[in-house]
């Protein structure tokens, strides 16, 4: 049976950046990775209703810098910056180093796979029909300029006894084209019948040239080898 590679993982370093951008030696790596996980867990719990798309973590010179990409920056910042200060203290306590928090606004939440998946799950939890939720997400994405979108839901759809999978696609979603800018994410809806999984793929176009490459010193051109002609015996 054919299996699909993770659309984001296969594109890392080609057209997709990493969510954690830091280097560490062997002794510190595991601790940094663990604190990254705990920081993300803490922020996702605190900002559950703030439409957080992704959290990028950097570690410059014994400190931690967290960039929160959100569709609702006002909820994250809070009144006079009180909420963001509380988050900064929480992150600094978990990481054990001074923390800095930056907020980046997501201009078009309808073209962000994580926010689209979360929107569908919240509708499913409010007992909206799954087909209507899927169609609405697809129409909004295509209206705002997506080249293609695919939405898949799986579980006890509509309270059915037997779990099944249904999907809806519009436009093209080329998973094998590495230069294709495909945003992929998942979410879970916890309903009275059980958990319903939601997957979203959004194709935004092709990125020609890829990510900015690190310039390397040019090697001297190799001299072409002279071919010796064998004389006739």
From Swiss-Prot:
Domain of life per record: Bacteria
Domain KH type-2: 39-107
PROSITE patterns, per the entry: KH_TYPE_2, RIBOSOMAL_S3
A GO biological-process term: translation
CDD domains, sorted: KH-II_30S_S3 (cd02412)
Transmembrane segments: none
Gene Ontology MF annotations: mRNA binding; rRNA binding; structural constituent of ribosome
Keyword terms of this UniProt record: Ribonucleoprotein, Ribosomal protein, RNA-binding, rRNA-binding
InterPro entries: KH_dom (IPR004087), KH_dom-like_a/b (IPR015946), KH_dom_type_2 (IPR004044), KH_sf_prok-type (IPR009019), Ribosomal_S3_C_sf (IPR036419), Ribosomal_uS3_bac-typ (IPR005704), Ribosomal_uS3_C (IPR001351), Ribosomal_uS3_CS (IPR018280)
Cystine pairs: none
GO cellular component: cytosolic small ribosomal subunit
Annotated SMART domains: KH (SM00322)
HAMAP family: Ribosomal_uS3_B
Family under the similarity heading: Belongs to the universal ribosomal protein uS3 family.
Role noted for this protein: Binds the lower part of the 30S subunit head. Binds mRNA in the 70S ribosome, positioning it for translation.
NCBIfam families in the record: rpsC_bact
Subunit-level organization: Part of the 30S ribosomal subunit. Forms a tight complex with proteins S10 and S14.
Protein name per UniProt: Small ribosomal subunit protein uS3
Originating species: Edwardsiella ictaluri (strain 93-146)
Gene name of the record: rpsC
């Amino acid at each position: 049976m054919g299996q699909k590679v993770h659309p984001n993982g296969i594109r890392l370093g080609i057209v997709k950046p990493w969510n954690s951008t830091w280097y560490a030696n062997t002794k510190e790596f595991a601790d940094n990775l663990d604190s990254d996980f705990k920081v993300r867990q803490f922020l996702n719990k605190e900002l559950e209703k703030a439409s957080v798309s992704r959290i990028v973590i950097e570690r410059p010179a014994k400190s931690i810098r967290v960039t929160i990409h959100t569709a609702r920056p006002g909820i994250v910042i809070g009144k006079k910056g009180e909420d963001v200060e509380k988050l900064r203290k929480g992150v600094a306590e978990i990481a054990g180093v001074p923390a800095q928090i930056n907020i980046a606004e997501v201009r078009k939440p309808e073209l962000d796979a994580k926010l689209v998946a979360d929107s569908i799950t919240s509708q499913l939890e409010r007992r909206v029909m799954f087909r209507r939720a899927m169609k609405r997400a697809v129409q909004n994405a295509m209206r705002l300029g997506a080249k293609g979108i695919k939405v898949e839901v799986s579980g006890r759809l509509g309270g059915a006894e037997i779990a099944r999978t249904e999907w809806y696609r519009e436009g093209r979603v080329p998973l094998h084209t590495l230069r294709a800018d495909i945003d992929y994410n998942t979410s879970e809806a916890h309903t009275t019948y059980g958990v319903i999984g939601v997957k979203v793929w959004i194709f935004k176009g092709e990125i020609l040239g890829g990510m900015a490459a690190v310039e390397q010193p040019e090697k001297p051109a190799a001299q072409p080898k002279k071919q010796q002609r064998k004389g006739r015996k």
